Amino acid sequence: MPRRSILSATERESLLALPDAKDELIRHYTFNETDLSVIRQRRGAANRLGFAVQLCYLRFPGTFLGVDEPPFPPLLRMVAAQLKMPVESWSEYGQREQTRREHLVELQTVFGFKPFTMSHYRQAVHTLTELALQTDKGIVLASALVENLRRQSIILPAMNAIERASAEAITRANRRIYAALTDSLLSPHRQRLDELLKRKDGSKVTWLAWLRQSPAKPNSRHMLEHIERLKSWQALDLPAGIERQVHQNRLLKIAREGGQMTPADLAKFEVQRRYATLVALAIEGMATVTDEIIDLHDRIIGKLFNAAKNKHQQQFQASGKAINDKVRMYGRIGQALIEAKQSGSDPFAAIEAVMPWDTFAASVTEAQTLARPADFDFLHHIGESYATLRRYAPQFLGVLKLRAAPAAKGVLDAIDMLRGMNSDSARKVPADAPTAFIKPRWAKLVLTDDGIDRRYYELCALSELKNALRSGDVWVQGSRQFKDFDEYLVPVEKFATLKLASELPLAVATDCDQYLHDRLELLEAQLATVNRMASANDLPDAIITTASGLKITPLDAAVPDAAQAMIDQTAMLLPHLKITELLMEVDEWTGFTRHFTHLKTSDTAKDKTLLLTTILADAINLGLTKMAESCPGTTYAKLSWLQAWHIRDETYSTALAELVNAQFRQPFAGNWGDGTTSSSDGQNFRTGSKAESTGHINPKYGSSPGRTFYTHISDQYAPFSAKVVNVGIRDSTYVLDGLLYHESDLRIEEHYTDTAGFTDHVFGLMHLLGFRFAPRIRDLGETKLFIPKGDAAYDALKPMISSDRLNIKQIRAHWDEILRLATSIKQGTVTASLMLRKLGSYPRQNGLAVALRELGRIERTLFILDWLQSVELRRRVHAGLNKGEARNALARAVFFYRLGEIRDRSFEQQRYRASGLNLVTAAIVLWNTVYLERATSALRGNGTALDDTLLQYLSPLGWEHINLTGDYLWRSSAKVGAGKFRPLRPLPPA
């Protein structure tokens, strides 16, 4: 029987925790007439109250209250109120043990409660084993068991029995998983897997370590090296379909555990477990390398296009002076010809008066040389980089197993033909080669008088392949990011069942006719209202004219003088402390470090200061090596080991949720909002040193490569989500991820972004998923309104109404596809960002992409109409975005080492940097909130009058009182006792 504990003390308490919210108490503990009739049959007030309380405990949480266990006070008060008797009667209950036993027997008889038996235990283990095939999280299994027992009215056993059943289920599931991954392996498979643990020829690393290395710079040499990695993975030739034998969560967990092991550690594993771990590593490694190869190709193509654009611009600029001279010269000649016509003189003589005829004739020849064709384009410069692509293209096309949707069949046909040419060493493209995929822009380069140009044909095919992979029209066997679009979605059968049962997890009517009727009726009403207000010049702080379009008066963002004085006063009271002291104090309040559990054992970190040191190394961008030097008593080896086993995306996420929830529960945070609105924004960090090649360039941030940390922040200043994204991808791609996949208790209803955060697709999905979307759109007057029919009724809005009309037929035709997509995103079958990237990359004619865009246009138009009518909406959005920008300033101050540059080549390490930074800024926000409340109380206690309406101007984002630099010591200079706080700084003399 497994002995290892799989639940923490906090998790054990949570399983039997009683509700304290009033609505939950009412839901669980309200008696009906039958209940009251049975209760009233007891003799004496104490017995009636005790019997009723025991009934409540048996129903929820499912236990029987022991002799020495006092009842939960809110529950006792509620029961006593229903029975109309004093709570003091409880003290007289159950003085005889026999009374309690009799009550338990009667409760079982009357209400059908059953004791937990060995038969139930065996059934529980059997049931939980099926769940354990999906997850080995102890709390998930134990919670499922407890809920199942409650549904069956089975009295919960002791907690160690629940934990033992869950642990046994995990052990059984592990055996089944190992068997599923190894039973089909033959002797050659096992021999090839064993080779992974041996040292690579001529190298100091094992084959496994080499295969798991990330690619370096996006160039042909590194591409070829990575292709060799994929070929090595493929050479294992694992049994077909083996990756589908095990749930993805468990496969990832086994692979992650194996990735932290040394070859010596893996060799010590029991045989079946060792081969299962190596198979999991191979499956995940193959998918990762496949995706990385496609990403490398995407980035190489992007670099070549950028280089061609730059060369094109440089050449044009270089000829700029000559072109200008010619324009000025022809201006003089033109003026001379005009004067000659007016005077009736000889035009040729007029030209020769400006310059000799031979010089004029030569200038015409020069002008023809300088002139560019009407379809002036940089694309011809791509041909100069053909050799770069040619170095890896044959291997690239040969190693990927591609499939295509009908829309991309032409691209795949061209790829197949290129593969054949590569294998036959053919140089000339056949005259009957596929050409339907060639866009007009490429046609003039590819299709020449001498036939098909091989160089541009291959460049065009590889470029179009990149686009088709992005959109999902072409997918790759063995990939995670580039699968068939349909594979990402909820299965059609499951979707149909959910829709039929009216159980789709969406916030809208799922009947298309009803939905469109309601939204279009609202749209027409809003259009009429705003048109009337615009005609009467009644729009608040806004005006629409035919001549100048929409003009909106900017908001006054000044902070009242009284509020500024309060900000200054409270800032002077906040205690000075080190960042290490702040983190220790916040951990004392929240226990967030307990969430950084061991990957294998789920134990908490034994050395909390070592864990905090590792987190801080991420947050301040110092890295483990330098942090070990700055933190006495710490070594790199210790920090590296702790990071490998305790620091993961999910542990950072749950720890962050702990801090966000603590901020949500702070009464003082209510001055800034109720936790139902949020904003998101991207913050650019340059990539340097080894990480420079992993960065992307966005002209918005200059010419240096970088990464974006995309962060969501609540109206209470809590940063509840952070994600590392490419600077070249629009912010809107990631807006929904933060709203859907955070783990905090926040229930966001309204969300704000800047212009980069919106697209019509995002507007549509936001509405379907139950969020009110409110972006601050730059140049709003140029953002058109969309209506379903003629604009004659809306004369005042004509400058803003698009000439295109809403395509309602397209929405109707693809309604079920829209619902299925939204359902898949809501249920977590696929991330919103992945789907939005693919939809944004689709060709214009794709039905689903167009239908979702049209639905989004309805919602965008409704939003703009609201914006025109409501100054309050504009203020909310402005205030929300200002909070995000202020939080970015704090993040920049914390992330100050290494010049604020990201220098980690590994994307995993870059994610840890972002997560550590977000966690520490959340801790600073919480600490500041607690002490701002104490500071305002101190000011009031000193006789200072504070206006409650001005408290909203205080901000928990200050860091002037926090020492972020120096040696990182974890011994507090001012020890704070449990439940106590640091003294504020003295109040300044009046």
From Swiss-Prot:
One Pfam family here: DUF4158
Span list, region Disordered: 673-698
GO-annotated molecular function: DNA binding; transposase activity
InterPro entries, alphabetized: DUF4158, Tn3-like_transpos, Tn3_Tnp_DDE_dom
Lineage top rank: taxon: Bacteria
GO biological process, any: DNA transposition
Keywords for the protein's UniProt record, in alphabetical order: DNA recombination, DNA-binding, Transposable element, Transposition
General function of this protein: Required for transposition of transposon Tn3926.
NCBIfam families cross-referenced by the UniProt entry: transpos_Tn3 (NF033527)
Protein's name in the database: Transposase for transposon Tn3926
Organism this protein belongs to: Escherichia coli
Protein encoded by which gene: tnpA
